[in-house]
Amino acid sequence: MERKGIFIKVFSYTIIVLLLLVGVTATLFAQQFVSYFRAMEAQQTVKSYQPLVELIQNSDRLDMQEVAGLFHYNNQSFEFYIEDKEGSVLYATPNADTSNSVRPDFLYVVHRDDNISIVAQSKAGVGLLYQGLTIRGIVMIAIMVVFSLLCAYIFARQMTTPIKALADSANKMANLKEVPPPLERKDELGALAHDMHSMYIRLKETIARLEDEIAREHELEETQRYFFAAASHELKTPIAAVSVLLEGMLENIGDYKDHSKYLRECIKMMDRQGKTISEILELVSLNDGRIVPIAEPLDIGRTVAELLPDFQTLAEANNQRFVTDIPAGQIVLSDPKLIQKALSNVILNAVQNTPQGGEVRIWSEPGAEKYRLSVLNMGVHIDDTALSKLFIPFYRIDQARSRKSGRSGLGLAIVQKTLDAMSLQYALENTSDGVLFWLDLPPTSTL
């Protein structure tokens, strides 16, 4: 069903009210005007016939016609007649209408007693005047009707224009289109438009946040799907290798008859498998937010010094050396266990990727409300496309070499989740001297 516009409705209601008001007003004024006109005409007529009344009162019936004729001769514009109490006409002017067809509104009894009545008729000029005034009244009513139509149109236009603009804006909002801010108004419609636009802005922000959340959820699902697929692959390969070794030993095939040798290989594989599973569980805990950082004062130099002995044997085996430059007294606020875990993985990754005879440099320097701790493995360059993927779980630049050396590919992923849990700034980037990892730590004075 086609909807009627609000303009037509407001205009119709307004014009109906105005026309009713004009009609009632015109009716009241017409009644008042007629009553006033009749009263004035009656008063004037009685006054005009007063000399005749006096003459007739002082005359007998025989002289009445002569007196009346003389009065009419002197006032030829007057039309009247005289009748007795039985209704018989005693005298009538030539143009007087004594029949009952004359409207009572145009008859005036200017005198009445026990014997006679003098009945005067309205003058023709008075009738024409009455007719002219009536026409003028009709014209005035027509003008008032036209004026009412104009006022109704202006009023309806003024009332419906902001409402239609508000409806158009609401339609655009429903379709998520751009809506400009409303014009300033000092009435309720202005307040409504402002509130609707504010609600629209908040709705857009909420939708944007929801879209971001959906995108993050989708990204998280993709990451989890990749993580579980990669984890399954990482766990399946060693298990398959151990199964082959065990079957060979059970069947006493070839070299597999040397059970002690291959059992030790199986134990090594299972140890690496256990380490990988532990790292997977740790990464899952970090990803689920079950590990809550507890910030404590931490000496950077002492923390690094306590970690380096764990990697000294590996570095010496590759003829590598550590160079540290961390001034004493650099105290930061961080979770000791989490920061040690992250630094352990960073240093291990640096040692594993530094060429034989190379150098791993570790230093810190103060900055604006922070201490920057840096780890640089000299003489190394990583392709930029691979550099951005190093924090992805199970990603390895050299798959064969990394698997042979026992690397799980989870070290930097654990570093990323750990530092993100502590809301710390960090980066891994290429420099002219090698690959640099830096980490910003807040000093104790900032918290």
UniProtKB/Swiss-Prot annotation:
Residues 157-208 form the HAMP domain. Pfam families: HAMP (PF00672), HATPase_c (PF02518), HisKA (PF00512). It is a multi-pass membrane protein. Residues 230-445 form the Histidine kinase domain. The modification Phosphohistidine is found at H233. One of its GO terms (molecular function) is ATP binding. One of its GO terms (cellular component) is plasma membrane. It is found in: Cell membrane. Keywords: Antibiotic resistance, ATP-binding, Cell membrane, Cell wall biogenesis/degradation, Kinase, Membrane, Nucleotide-binding, Phosphoprotein, Transferase, Transmembrane, Transmembrane helix, Two-component regulatory system. Signal peptide: none annotated. Its main location: membrane. One of its GO terms (biological process) is cellular response to phosphate starvation. It catalyses: ATP + protein L-histidine = ADP + protein N-phospho-L-histidine. Member of the two-component regulatory system VanSB/VanRB. Activates the transcription of vanSB, vanYB and vanW in response to vancomycin which results in vancomycin resistance. VanSB may activate VanRB by phosphorylation. May also act as a phospho-VanRB phosphatase. This is Sensor protein VanSB. It comes from Enterococcus faecalis (strain ATCC 700802 / V583). The lineage of its organism: Bacteria, Bacillati, Bacillota, Bacilli, Lactobacillales.
